[in-house]
Amino acid sequence: MADPKYADLPGIARNEPDVYETSDLPEDDQAEFDAEELSSTSVEHIIVNPNAAYDKFKDKRVGTKGLDFSDRIGKTKRTGYESGDYEMLGEGLGVKETPQQKYQRLLHEVQELTTEVEKIKTTVKESATEEKLTPVVLAKQLAALKQQLVASHLEKLLGPDAAINLADPDGALAKRLLLQLEATKSSKGSSGGKSTGGTPPDSSLVTYELHSRPEQDKFSQAAKVAELEKRLTELEATVRCDQDAQNPLSAGLQGACLMETVELLQAKVNALDLAVLDQVEARLQSVLGKVNEIAKHKASVEDADTQNKVHQLYETIQRWSPVASTLPELVQRLVTIKQLHEQAMQFGQLLTHLDTTQQMMASSLKDNTALLTQVQTTMRENLATVEGNFASIDARMKKLGK
């Protein structure tokens, strides 16, 4: 029954069923919905392998020493992660620098060193207690280093495309020369109809510098020799492979190298000379005659052995004939004896059981005899006691009668 204090409150519907929940889903079930699968071609689905990403960034640490990402206001500038104009490979990555990255790194380091030396020259005064490597000397050495770096002719040879083609300078140089030749041809073709004579100006001249690389030639020659040696080794390995025992041509071809195998083959070819073949044929004829004689002798020996075995088998059959006639009777007797033995075994078992029963009965009789003797003795004693009691009673009765 409802509490009466809520009976007269306004806004309470009377004579209507109570409703405790709405048609909406509960709050926990409202969050469950099926996400739409994006099937648009404009959306790029990127498949990320978490295991590969974990292996790539495993054991990697971000150095936060001396970094400050706070928004505090101060005189000093808050430094975050430093970034440069070029990509620098870290130490211990196991990745070899390309010529482009190496050139950019050296140029960048030389520029940084030049800036630092200029700052030192403007701030530090020369004195007698300076170190051996003074800023002035360091600036001179730095200028020489920069001159050597520029003297590599990389940007001069490859032009503005050095950052792109520095990984293959030879190919880039060839492409650059071809482009300049095409440009020269086109400029000559266009200016040929207008110029009437005289020497061309200096600006139309193209000067090429050819740099010979004997080390590269030696390296390519050594690579060709190594490739030839590799192919020769494979050929030798193929020639001296495992021999086939069934192939008579490959018998004896077990040379350690290609030259020895060729010499063995040459010896086999020389053995096929006509004079040598006649001698071999004569020897083969004599060997063939001996083989025929051995085959005949072997046939006669085999025939004698066969006759001996047949004679022994006939004698065995002759001895077996009388035994075969008596075999059915012998089998019948054996069956009868088997039955008799089974009956005798059963009779023996019965006798054993009877003997055991007789022994049990004898022991029971002995026990009963002993018990009977005890009962008789007890009865005699009891009878004597009863007789004595009756005698005493009679004596008392007689005394009472007097």
Swiss-Prot record:
Quote the InterPro entries the UniProt record gives: Dynamitin
As stated in the Swiss-Prot or TrEMBL entry, residues carrying the post-translational modification Phosphothreonine are: 134, 199
Q: Please list the residues that carry the modification Phosphoserine.
A: 83, 321
UniProt subcellular location: Cytoplasm, Cytoskeleton, Microtubule organizing center, Centrosome; Membrane; Cytoplasm, Cytoskeleton
- Signal peptide residues on this chain, from the entry's feature table: none
Q: Which residues form a coiled coil?
A: 100-130, 215-247
Q: Which UniProt keywords apply?
A: Acetylation, Coiled coil, Cytoplasm, Cytoskeleton, Dynein, Membrane, Microtubule, Phosphoprotein
In the UniProt record, does the keyword Cell membrane occur? no
Q: Which residues carry this modification: Phosphotyrosine?
A: 6, 86
Q: List the disulfide bonds.
A: none
Q: Which family does it belong to?
A: Belongs to the dynactin subunit 2 family.
Q: What is this protein called?
A: Dynactin subunit 2
Q: Which organism is it from?
A: Rattus norvegicus (Rat)
Identify the gene encoding this protein: Dctn2
